């Protein structure tokens, strides 16, 4: 298992209608993403736990792209990965934000 941690400055306030938002299913070739409110001085943190070791540069590119498109403030993102492709990761991250903005229902 490999753990990767990232931190980005956020500009967009996220209103959580529930305590957290969870999307995806941790299964072969997929991942689950949890968004939680957190006092992070306006930052967004991302922690990835993955079984696929050695893909740090790919993860960094995908997460940096997401942070540019969705610069959330005071949000902790936890990703549990079971070998998802970059396209699936981006899709699930966008789904998580859409769920958050849509009131918490996937």
Curated annotation (Swiss-Prot):
Q: Please describe the post-translational modifications of this protein.
A: Covalently binds the prosthetic group of malonate decarboxylase.
User: To which protein family does this belong?
Assistant: Belongs to the MdcC family.
Which organism is this protein's natural source? Stenotrophomonas maltophilia (strain R551-3)
GO CC annotations on file:
cytoplasm
Sorted keywords for this record are: Cytoplasm, Phosphoprotein
Where is it chiefly localized?
cytoplasm
O-(phosphoribosyl dephospho-coenzyme A)serine: modified positions: 28
UniProt superkingdom: Bacteria
Q: Where in the cell is it found?
A: Cytoplasm
Please describe what this protein does. Answer: Subunit of malonate decarboxylase, it is an acyl carrier protein to which acetyl and malonyl thioester residues are bound via a 2'-(5''-phosphoribosyl)-3'-dephospho-CoA prosthetic group and turn over during the catalytic mechanism.
Supply the name of the protein: Malonate decarboxylase acyl carrier protein
GO MF annotation: an example: acyl carrier activity
- Kindly list any coiled-coil regions of this protein: none
NCBIfam families found in the cross-reference section = malonate_delta
- Which InterPro entries does its entry note? Mal_deCO2ase/Cit_lyase_ACP, Malonate_deCO2ase_dsu
């Amino acid at each position: 298992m490999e753990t990767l941690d990232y931190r980005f400055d956020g500009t967009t306030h996220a209103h959580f209608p529930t305590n957290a938002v969870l999307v995806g299913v941790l299964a072969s070739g997929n991942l689950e993403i949890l968004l939680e409110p957190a006092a992070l001085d306006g930052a967004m943190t991302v922690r990835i736990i993955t079984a696929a070791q050695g893909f740090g540069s790919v993860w960094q590119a995908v997460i940096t792209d997401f942070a540019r498109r969705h610069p959330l403030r005071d949000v902790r993102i936890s990703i549990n990965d079971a070998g998802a492709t970059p396209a699936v990761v981006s899709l699930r991250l966008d789904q998580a934000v859409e769920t958050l903005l849509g009131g918490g229902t996937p």
